[in-house]
Every structure is written in structure tokens, then in C-alpha cells.
């Protein structure tokens, strides 16, 4: 059997859009067939039917009304599908044979612009990634077609670089080079929910000069080859999906990866910059506190500022000074916010104009917005800060565009462009004439109705109109007997009435409909001319929109600072940050006012480089560390900060390792995830970075974890290429011994008060390490049953009594294992039981220490007695040195530490 002509046409079109659900226009419906129909029926909960198609079996089919298509398209796109819109591209009345059809647009997650599904305050980005394996380089291009933003960058071909940029922009769609490393593709897939497509190298490399020159003109000539190729693929993809060149995408913003603070995916999540960890919503994030902007453009800009803090001191200072000027003039800032309030989303209106789908109401919104600009400009006219002066100087009042729209478009125009009622009286003479004819015709219709009522005596007679039957005279059945014979021609029969026409009414109908059709057509054409004229000035409009967005951000930061008692920070590049009475801006917002406990911070490249913070769970260690990072970040976006005084050293990167969970999809355990994050930090942090490390090593055995944490601290402080400013929270109290041992390490703890066997968290960071973790007390606060709490105390007491013997036995095994390593192969893990051969004199020494260590707690510790100098110890006198340890001055844990040090030295001497 042969396919029907319509089905043959369907398959010819579908062949070019295999990765899309094809919406095939048939009359007033979009129909889907075969697999597309099955998918759409399942996802949209539509009834799946069938249609004869010329094959043995009917084609599965489902459909939706074209006038309700937006909601269905939005639901499919939100689920990650692409939708190809296939329209009838010729009038069925004049078509010879089957009506011509073609795809007029492909709608994808990254190119969907319908306001019902795109968040006003978030960009809808699409990204392309190009890689050059030989040069080990990559480039990325990013755009939001609804706003016209187009950015590009390049850097080393490293997983971290790519994943960081993906986490920053959070694109809805990513186009990858299909030869990209498979492991990297897997990591990208696990990192983002974006729809991922893969394209051959030709898609990136062919005709890039031609494509970019057509889109950007001479501006593209100065781009690097790498950026040209990623940008080429992105522009091609836009052309492939939108089927037109978008004029609002007219410039490329090339940025360097070092222009902004680096914040990796883990840190963005842990710091909750734009969404909270639990619900993934804005509430509870830093953006939630800071965003009191007046415009959608300003809100998107502020989000971008938070995602991309500055690292240039001069640029930060420019923003801070502008915020300060508005902060100090409350009346001025109130006036500015009021003026900004009525400005619509100019960027997205321009996106609609560029995409040829802006209606008359969009142009009225644009006119209203432009009309506010002179007032905005006047408000900041006398400002003295450099940034505000620049805004005033560069702000175009767009008077010519305002006047065009003011005299041309009706204030309350029709939503449908082809239904007329768009253009103001007096703008076009021909439109005025047609309207007069239409008005006269309607007056004639009204007079006809009155005449016929008088002639027939039927008071309920009326003259009406509908698009199917045109004009008619309607008489109810109750008045049939009053109808003069031969006066009317029957046109339509209803249940309770009859509709008629007269030759005279038919004649005027033709004149009226002719005038109406011509009027609607003429208004549509003139509207397109006006819209095109506005589009010719899209460069000016985009520049103005950007200034308004930035001005909104500055005004907003001044308002938020006043509302939340923030202060202007000082900035330095000396490596030292001092914060007095710092507060966490989000936490203080969600707890009762006045209950947040502020804390001081001093962190630098010298004696306060790595702060070891100890204290019980729930005491506030993590909040404090996040607070320091967020205050630093706020300063670098140009915001005032929550403190009484702050002098912030500019940081190039913020890293956090706070909390972890299994990465089951990636095949990584909690501990593996933790170690991967620590590894990433140690490889990429610099001396100008800020690092937050929380409970490093807790995902494995106690001694393995302690060893790793200890080693990480040493590496950070002693590696001259690293030495980053670090906040290190831990429950390993043994690490507090590193103060004085390693330059730059300082101990801090969270103050706790004990009252009647209960603990009170004071939330205050104080100098010195904590002497216990209060784990059982925290468990009690969490509601663990008393029976469990009491038993835990008994077990803890027993373990503390036995800890010395157990730990020293463990150390003894390591000493003997080190001896065996010289003779045979490497040893098993330190916590495994194994037989060892020990010389009798060694056994006697160790047993003596074990027998006496349980009483050691009663002896006072003197720091100078427990410091050992191993620099001159050799193999021959190692045992002698061990025997000389003054066990009476050591408690059990200190004895363990000393033996661990001896074991380490023994291994080094092998």
C-alpha cells in the first residue's frame, strides 16, 4: 500500500527533525503521528487515536487545538523535549493539490521564550562547548535569546573549568562537540539537568567567518579562533531553531575566567547563593536577602553579579562608592526606586521584537518604560560617584522612539494583530477613511434595525453579525406571524428564531466586510512597519536596558544595606581580612530579630592563615565559616556587608568542603566525594583563595581521617605555592596541637556553657581549642531516649579508660610493621590485627607505658615537656628515645600522639 499524499509530506518533513516532536498543522489543530503521537499522548495525557495513512495499520495520532498550543508546548519543553512547529505556508483556498507545509520554528528548552514558562527573574541560557584536544583548550559560548545576552570565553580543557561555568550559568540546554571525552560528557550529564545535544566538528568549524560576520558584523573579527568556533555553533543552532537571524543578539561579550571570582559547583550549593539546598528555591538564599530590585532586568543582573563576583579592586570600589552615595541620601534613592518601579522588562520586549512576535501591547509597555527614563536621568543628574555619573551620561532618553509609539499605537490595542484596532486615529489617512466608512456602515445597520422594527411592529427584531453567516435580521418564532410576506430571505433556522437577509443588507454587508478586511490588513502592515522601525534602534535600546538594570542593582543594594544594617567594607589586596561583629545575612533573617550572635574574624597570610575551629555539632561552626565566605563575596559584588566594621582582602576563588553525600550515579561513596572535593581544592586554590573545610576525614576510620586532616593542614600551610586562607572545622581535637607546630595555624572554638549537665550553645567564636565534643549532650538535645543517653555515657567512660591501651597497641603494631617493611613487602591497613615479632626490650618499654598511662590524667601537662625534637634521632637510638618519654606528664591521648610521631619518624628512617 502507498502512503497518502499528506502522509508522504509528513514523512518528508519529519526526516529533517528526527529529534523533535513534530506539531503538524491540519486546519485548526496540530496533529502528531506515530511515535510522536505516542510520546505526546503519554506526556500530555491526550487521547491516542488513529488515522488512515495508506499503510496496512492506521497511524497512531493525537492532536491539540492550535490556539491552545502554548501550554502544551511548554509542558513538553519543560520535560526536555524539542518541538518542531510545522505550519501551512500557503492559503488552502489557492493551493493546487496538497497545501504546502514547512517547519517555521523549533522550540527547545534553551530557546523557549514564552513568558508563561520562562521565569522573569532568571535567564534562560543555552551553551555550546568546543574543545581542541591537541592544544588542550576549550571554549564556551552562552546566550539567552530572550534578552540578547551573548557571552564567550576560553580556557584550559579541564573538567573543573567546564563544570564551574555550567554551574555558574545553569543553562537549560548544552550543545557539545561529539568528540568530547566520554568521561567529561558523563560528568556534565551528572552535573546538570540541561538537555544535551551533540554535534559533529563541522557544525563548529565550517563557515564560521561567514556566519559570525552575518550576525555580529566586524565585531567578530577580533575574536580568538577557539571562541569563533563555539560561537559559530551557537549562532547556527539559533538559526536552525528560530529560522531567522535575531537582531537583539548583536554583540559578543568576551570574558576571561580570571575576570571574576571562581566558585565551583560544590561551593555555590554549600553557600546557597541563589537557591537553598533543601528545596532548590530562592527563599533562604543570599539572593533572597539581597533582591529587592524594582525591575526584572535588575533582578537578573543582580543574580549574575552574585554568580560572578569581581576580583578587580577598582571595579569593586566603583560599585561600593555608588551604593554609598545612594545609601547616604535616602530621599534620592526612594525617588529612584519609585521611578524604576514602572519600567517593564525592556530586554525581553526587545527579544520579542527581534523574534517577530511582539504585539501592540508589548510596544505600549516599551513606550511606558521609555517614558520613565527622563525622570530617572533627572534623579541621578547631580550624583558625584563615578559610576552614577557614567550612567547619567550614557543613558539615552530615546525620545524619538517614544514619540513614534505615542502617536501611532492605541493605548489599549487588540491582542491579536490581524484583528485591527491597533493604530491611533490621525496616524494614517487611509486608515481614517476606512474607519469612517466602517462607522457609517454601522450607523446604517443601526438605522436599518430601527426601520424594520417600526415597519414590522416586532420590537424584539435585531440586526446581528457573526463571522460565519455575516449580517442577518433575527426574529423570534413567537413573532413569525408578524413577518411581512416576501420582505425577507431566509438565511438560518435556530431553535427559537429565524434569521433573514435582504438584498439591501447583503449589499451593505459586502461594503462593510470589505472595508473591515482592508482596514485590518492595513493596520497590520503599518504595525509591522512601526515594529521594524523600533527594531532598527535595538542597539540603543539594549544599551539603555543594561544601564537601567545596573542602576536598579546599585539602588537595590543601597536599600538592602539600610534595611539590614549593613556597612560599607574597606578593600585591600594585602591578604588580610578583618571582620568585626560579622553576621550571616540569611540566618539572621530567618531567626527572631536580635538573636543572632555576631563574631569577629581575622584571617591573613601570616599568623592567622589557617583557623582550626573546634566545638560540638549544632554550635555554629559551619554557619560561621559560611558567614566569612558570604561577607567576602558580598563585598566583591559591590554590596555593603553585615558587620560593624570590615576590611576585606580580595580573593580570587572560594572553595568549600562542607557536607557530602553519596554520588550513586557516579559510583562514588560519601568519603570518595569528600576526597575528590579536597583534591580539587588542593590542586586549584592559590594564596589569594578562601577555603572552607568542614570535618575533613570524617567519612573513614578515626585514625585514617585524623591522618588525612593533619596532612591536609600541613600541605596548605607549608606548600609555598598554596598557603591559602583557610577555615578548618573539625572534631579531631588532636589537631589543636598544630598551633605552634605549624606557622599560620591558630585555634578557635565555639563557646559552650554547661548548666546542670546540660549544654547551652553560646554561638561565640573564641580563641583556643575546644576540649571536648559534647556529642552525647547534642544527642540528648536531639531527643534521643534517656536510656540510650545513659548507656552512651557508660560506654564513653569505658572507652576513655581503654583508649590509651588500645591506641598504644595500635602504635606498637605500626612500629613493628615499619621494621618488617625493611625486610619484606608493605603492611596491611593499620587497624588490621597481625602477628609481629618484637624484641623483648621493646615489649617491656611499651608495656610499662601502657600500665602507667591510665593514671596519667592526674598529672598536670606542661607544653614544654611534651615537645620532642626528632631531627637527630636515628635508627640506633629510636628505642632509647621512646623509653625516655615522660609518661607521667602525658594523658592517654597525648601518649597516642607521641607514639604516632615516633612511628612516622621510624618509617622516614627506613
UniProtKB/Swiss-Prot annotation:
Which gene name does the record give?
A: mutS
Q: Which GO terms describe its cellular component?
A: cytosol
Descriptive protein name: DNA mismatch repair protein MutS
Family assignment?
Answer: Belongs to the DNA mismatch repair MutS family.
Sorted alphabetically, the keyword list is: ATP-binding, DNA damage, DNA repair, DNA-binding, Nucleotide-binding
In the record, biological process GO terms are: mismatch repair
MF annotations from Gene Ontology: ATP binding; ATP-dependent DNA damage sensor activity; damaged DNA binding; mismatched DNA binding
Residues given in the record as ATP binding sites:
615-622
Gene3D superfamilies in the record = 1.10.1420.10, DNA repair protein MutS, domain I, MutS, connector domain, P-loop containing nucleotide triphosphate hydrolases
- Report the domain of life of the source organism: Bacteria
Function, please?
This protein is involved in the repair of mismatches in DNA. It is possible that it carries out the mismatch recognition step. This protein has a weak ATPase activity.
One Pfam match? MutS_I
- The disulfide bonds in this chain are none
